[in-house]
Curated annotation (Swiss-Prot):
Belongs to the transferase hexapeptide repeat family. It is found in: Cytoplasm. This is 2,3,4,5-tetrahydropyridine-2,6-dicarboxylate N-succinyltransferase. It holds the Pfam family Hexapep_2. The keyword GTP-binding does not apply. GO terms for molecular function: 2,3,4,5-tetrahydropyridine-2,6-dicarboxylate N-succinyltransferase activity; nucleotidyltransferase activity. It is an enzyme of class 2 (transferase). Its EC number is 2.3.1.117. One of its GO terms (cellular component) is cytoplasm. It comes from Legionella pneumophila (strain Lens). One of its GO terms (biological process) is lysine biosynthetic process via diaminopimelate. HAMAP family: DapD (MF_00811).
Amino acid sequence: MNSLQALIEQAFENRQNLSLNTASSDLINAINEVLSGLDNGQFRVAEKINGEWTVHQWLKKAVLLSFKLFPNQIIDAGFCKFYDKIPLKYTDSSNEQFQQSGVRVVPHAMVRRGAYIAKNTVLMPSYVNIGAYIDEGVMVDTWATVGSCAQIGKNVHISGGAGIGGVLEPLQANPTIIEDNCFIGARSEIVEGVIVEKNSVISMGVFLGQSTKIYNRITGEVSYGRIPAGSVVVAGNLPSHDGSHSLYCAVIVKQVDEKTRAKVSINDLLRANQDD
């Protein structure tokens, strides 16, 4: 545990006794250092280590401490003003800084400080919350939301109105993770720390939480909380044992390898559920 992490951990344990007036300058500086590190990609709330996702809870604790200790302030967005504890990421960015970032930000896209946006990303009018990590080549389409501490991989397309859930509270919850080369269909919601593994396609209007049944029609298996790599997923229903009703589920209709995913259009993959 480094000194920065130790300071954050200790402060979080004593958070009930902390206020802006009682917090030390060292603590305020430490929180700002974490937010800056999240903002520029130096820190990530979650990262893949030896093939497994590891969550750095202390970074989430620093974000929560910022909400407790930082005062609200005026945020001037030009066309109107806001009043919040966390400033916007691009408020003071110059033309040169935007060019260096390689990010395209369409009017009315909102990104909070502490979110990392990698190059070749396009932000349509959308919302990206603090602690989120968006890797290279991502499209965040109109009215899509990327929640606090969500992790978005390379070349992901998040379609219009889709929601990727945030997880600052409860603190023990893991962030929602979308791995590389995934397509998230319009108006879908993926929340509660669900992991969508690489090269997967989530159809329009699919809802995935930790309690959502994920039915694999190829194997007949039911799982929770994770979409396997290369899956094509649509919304469906599973009947009850007595046949009196059915309940919502997500259905894996097909699994494809990386070569097939690269060659075949999204629409062709989604038509797989019309085969029978």
